[in-house]
Amino acid sequence: MTSKRKPRRRSLSPAKLDEMIEEATVDAYGESEQTVGFFTLLEERLKLPFKTEVLGVEVIVDRLDTTDDQQIVAVCSRGKSQQRVSILNLTLPDPPPEGAEWIEAFRRWARGR
C-alpha cells in the first residue's frame, strides 16, 4: 500500500528571497517603512483565508494586521474566538497557501535586521 502524500514545497533559494526582500523594501527608509512594504505585499499576494494550526488546534487565518509596535500578525479564528499570532511564529500548512513565499522572505529579512 503506497501513501499519496503531496510533495513538500521546497524552500526558495537565498538569492530569490533576497530579490523578494529588495522588491518589498525598495524606496523604504528605515525599519518601519520596510515592514509596511512587506505588509502591503503580503496583503496583496497571500491567499486568505487558509487553515493552519496554533498550539495544536486548527484555526483559520482570516486576515493580516499590524500591531502598535509594527509587528505583522495573522488574525486567526476558531468559532467565535480570535487570536493574533506573529507572522514570524505562524506555522504554515502543508502545502502552504499561495503567496506564502512572502512570509518566508519576511522571516529572512527579520532575521537579518
Describe every region a protein language model picked out.
Residues 50-54:
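A short beta-strand micro-motif
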Residues 62, 75-77:
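Beta-strand residues in well-ordered beta-sheet regions across diverse protein folds
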Residues 68-75:
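Short aromatic-glycine-enriched beta-strand elements
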Residues 2-49:
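Mixed-charge, Lys/Arg-rich low-complexity intrinsically disordered regions
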Residues 81-90:
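A short macromolecule-binding patch
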Residues 3, 24-27, 100-113:
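Long, low-complexity intrinsically disordered regions
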Residues 57-65:
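Short beta-strand-centered aromatic/proline hotspots
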